[in-house]
Amino acid sequence: MQPHLFTPLTIGSVTLRNRIGMSPMCQYSAVDGFPTDWHLMHLGARAAGGVGLIILEATAVSPEGRISPFDLGIWSDDHIAALSRIVKLIESLGAVAGIQLAHAGRKASVGRPWEGGKPIAPANGGWPVVGPTAEPFAPGYPTPIPLDAAGIARVVADFATATKRARAAGFRWIEIHAAHGYLLHNFLSPLGNDRNDEYGGDLRGRVRLLSEVTAAVRAEWPSDLPLAVRLSCSDWTPEGLTIADTVEVARMLREQGVDLIDCSSGGIAPGITIPVGEGYQVPFAAQVRREANIATAAVGLITRPEHADAIVRNGDADLVLLGRELLRDPHWPLRAARALGHDLAPPPQYLRAW
C-alpha cells in the first residue's frame, strides 16, 4: 500500500505530489530584498530532493518589515522578476512554489544569527520598528512605534500589494506569517497587545489586524489558489495564547477563505520554557484540524519517515513541513520514500545514485 506521506494533496486547483513541504526558513542572504545565487541553490536542491511544496522564507511586505537587512522582500515591483526565476526553477523540478508574506514588527532590524543576531540601530543601517504598543520585545531591543490607524492601514495595504506581486511572480501558494512574535502574532497575543482600542482587548479585538490582512490578501489572491496562515498555536504560558484561542482564530480564518493552518508555536517573548521534543507541535495541528474543521500542516522536530507518515495516516495533519531536517538532508524525501517502500523518482541526472 502506498505510504500516506506520498499521496497527493489537492487544495483548489493546486496538487502537491506528496505531503512533504519545506518550511519557510530565513537564509539571511538577500541583497536589498533580492534573492541571490544562494537562494537558487538552496531552494532548487530541495525541489530536486523530492518535496511537494517549497515555501520561501519570510518575505517582507515592506522594507521595515524585514527581520534583518538580509531578508527577502516583495515591497517593490522590481523584486518580481528575480522571484519569478526562483518560481520557475522550483516548479521545473516538480514542486509547487509558495511564499510566506511577513512583517517582523518589533522583532525587526536585527543582524544575522551567526553574527550575533543583535538589534541594529538606525545609525548603523537598521530602522525604527513598529508594534501594537511601545513595549519592546526584550531588554536591549528598540522601543517600537505604536501603530496608529494610518499605520495599520499601510500594513494591510502592503500585504495586499505584496499578494499581487506574488501572483505576478507565478507563486501558487501563499502563507501569511502570523506566528513567532512577529507583527501579526504580536497583535494577536495578550502578552504583546494591551491596546484599549478596536485592535486590542479580547480575542476578537486582537485578531482584527490579522483578519483585515487576511481579507486583503484573499481579495487579491485567486480563489482556486491555496491560502495558508502560520499561527503560534500556543505561547506556552497560561497568560498567553492557548490552543483553545487558536481553534477559535482558525474558525474565523476558515470563514474568510483560508485553506490551511500551519501549526507552529512560541516566539512572543523570551524566557518562556517550551517542551521541545519529537513532534511536539503535532498535537496542535491535530486539534485545530479536528475542532476547526480546516486542513493543517504539522511542523517541528519531525525527522523520521515513519513518524511523518503516521502523522498523515492518523489524520493529525494534511501536510508535514520539514525545516532543519531538510537543511541537513536536501534529499530527505527520496530517502524517506525508500524507507517506506515507495518509488519516488529522483532527477534523471541523479539516477545512478538511487
Swiss-Prot record:
UniProt entry tagged with the keyword Oxidoreductase: yes
Name of the top EC class for this enzyme: oxidoreductase
Thermal profile of function: Highly thermoresistant.
Active site feature: Y182
Phosphoprotein is among the record's keywords: no
Annotated positions binding FMN: S23, P24, C26, A58, Q100, R230, L301, G323, R324
CDD domains hit by this protein: OYE_YqiM_FMN
pH and activity: Optimum pH is 6.0-9.0.
Ranges in a coiled coil: none
SUPFAM superfamilies: FMN-linked oxidoreductases (SSF51395)
Subunit structure: Homodimer. Behaves as an active monomer in solution while in the crystal packing assembles following the classical dimeric architecture of other thermophilic-like ene-reductases.
UniProt protein name: NADPH dehydrogenase
Lineage of origin: Bacteria, Bacillati, Chloroflexota, Chloroflexia, Chloroflexales
